[in-house]
Amino acid sequence: MIEFKPVRLEDRAVIERYTMPSGICNCDLAFANMYCWQAVFHSAWAEIGGFLVIRFQIDGGERIGYMQPVGEGDFGPILPLLREDAHAHGQRLRIIGLTDEGRDTIRRIVPCHFAFESDRALEDYVYNADDLRNLAGRRYQPKRNHINRFTAEYPDYRYEELTPDRFGECMALEREWRKAHEGHTSELCAEQRAMQRAFEHFEELGLIGGCIYVGDRLAAFTYGSAVNDHTFDTHVEKADTEFDGAFTIINKLFAQHLPERFTLINREEDLGLDGLRQAKLSYHPAFLQHKFAAICMHPDEVACKELWMKAFGDDEQFADSFIMRYYSRRRMLTAEAEGRMAAMLHLLPFRTELGRTTYIYGVATDPAFRGRGLASQLMREAMRLIAERGDDAAFLIPTPGKEWLREFYGRFGFAGDVPARFVSADRFDFGTNCSSFK
């Protein structure tokens, strides 16, 4: 098992020896983020075969994830070591924060053994630093107008460097801001603890910050640190909403006061919040830093994916997303032929206006084994299980354009068209169409 060590202040030089020249813009690689959020994610690190590997606890501490290894060359040879470490903790290997290149490396080294997914809500917004410093051109006119209104209304405003004597005021402003967002108490308390840790070790963490004052009153503050040699990451930005335009002006002035070596500014993710997404898009990012997650699939998941791709022709990303989020061997019925998975279907539980409902999803037969009655065999078993559970209804959506499927499913009691949409809480679309139901 790999010897991982908790991230400590004295580890900064070793960790940044890998991250600074990497060119990777992922905010999770900022040493200050690793250290300040350690109470939540239990960040740990190890050097393996010339690479830095960061290990986190994810999903509320239920699972562990490994960041994309950072170093020179191909990290493929250390994947077996990471897999062994994960297995020693009773888990499958999960790699998070993968760049496009990192994903492609894994696909090349171990094809068909990993499923990949990129969550739009977790992608970092990365901007050209000069765009934020200057706000030049027509597309930034609304931002300039906002700043002009602020400076006209508050002519006594001033920008100051964030120094230790101002930390108390910043925490007081953060507490007031938190009162207005009490619906997310646990997340905000964790952020407050991370801020407190940042202020306790501001200089040692290499943090840089700025403040806006109106008279003697703190209107906004922000701080961050380097992700790599040319990318700065804004970790925190808070403002008193009584001062309209405070967020806009501190964004610009802070960018102007950063060292010129920073040509990119990472303003982190939007967490899927519509208002935050629109605000970040309004500054016109140069690009979004993808952060793919990958899981090492079990043999039955590999077989499910292979059959899915053969039968439906969906893109690989869709199949991977389904497997990573919703696949369960307990909810999948299969038929085998010649030593491999030849047919399958999935029984997905939903709550609808009809009550407890099973959605029969992904009914598929390998083209090489069609005409043998395998799908009929699985449908009979599915209907038996649904009846045994006492579900109130069962739905399925026949593949559009294949009218013969209506007659096929009719043999099992499905009839009628009911407009239905099966979308999960995380917005995964299982199908929107007229459904047959029983």
Model feature map: region roles:
Residues 1-27, 136-194, 295-342, 347, ...:
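Short amphipathic alpha-helix that is part of the acyltransferase structural core
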Residues 24-27, 32-51, 200-210, 323-337, ...:
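A short helix-loop-beta-strand connector motif used in the catalytic cores of GNAT acetyltransferases and
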Residues 45, 49-57, 211, 216-226, ...:
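Conserved beta-strand in the GNAT
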Residues 66-74, 235-244, 360-371:
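A short, internal acetyl-CoA/4′-phosphopantetheine-binding micro-motif in the GNAT/acyltransferase core
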Residues 74-84, 243-256, 365, 371-384:
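Conserved acetyl-CoA-binding loop-helix of GNAT-fold acetyltransferases
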Residues 89-99, 260-268, 379, 386-399:
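Conserved GNAT acetyl-CoA-binding A-motif
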Residues 103-116, 271-288, 376, 388-392, ...:
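Conserved active-site alpha-helix within GNAT-family acetyltransferase domains
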Residues 117-125, 286-297, 397, 410-431:
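Conserved catalytic-core motifs of GNAT/GCN5-like acyltransferases
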